[in-house]
């Protein structure tokens, strides 16, 4: 988390909560979407299933509470180099205040820094 709060707070968690509330207020006041990025806690590294969850958001539950939409990117080949899912990135919708949850897989073309829908690369079944 690179942002800092305005006032004196007792912990980084309180500071992140203040920032989160401020971003939410800004979005409402200006009627615009605000995109905020956050690091995950290291808890992901300690467990078997490495897919991120809402509880992995670092330093504050207020990020989860204030957000209308929380999404994660997950690449299995980052943790499992021998996986069959090489270059596949899963876009996970973990929270959606006004819609469904779910995930979609994309092919990540590193040389172009580009995500491409997998349907372009799948062979039709006959």
Task: State where each predicted segment sits.
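Residues immediately C-terminal
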Residues: 1-4, 42
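Conserved ATPase-coupling elements of RecA-like P-loop NTPase cores
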Residues: 3-11
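C-terminal regions of RecA-like/P-loop NTPase motor modules
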Residues: 9, 21-31, 42-126
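Non-catalytic scaffold segments within catalytic domains of secreted glycoside hydrolases
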Residues: 14-18
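Conserved H-loop
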Residues: 37-39
């Amino acid at each position: 988390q690179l942002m800092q709060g305005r006032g004196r707070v007792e912990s980084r968690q309180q500071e992140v909560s203040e920032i989160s509330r401020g971003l939410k207020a800004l979005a409402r006041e200006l009627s615009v979407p605000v995109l905020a990025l956050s690091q995950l806690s290291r808890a992901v590294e300690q467990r078997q299933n490495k897919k991120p969850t809402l509880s992995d958001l670092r330093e504050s539950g207020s990020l989860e509470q204030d957000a209308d939409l929380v999404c994660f990117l997950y690449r299995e080949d980052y943790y499992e180099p021998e996986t069959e899912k090489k270059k596949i990135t899963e876009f996970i919708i973990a929270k959606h205040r006004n819609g469904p949850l779910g995930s979609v897989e994309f092919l990540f073309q590193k040389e172009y820094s580009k995500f491409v829908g997998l349907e372009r690369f799948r062979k039709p079944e006959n």
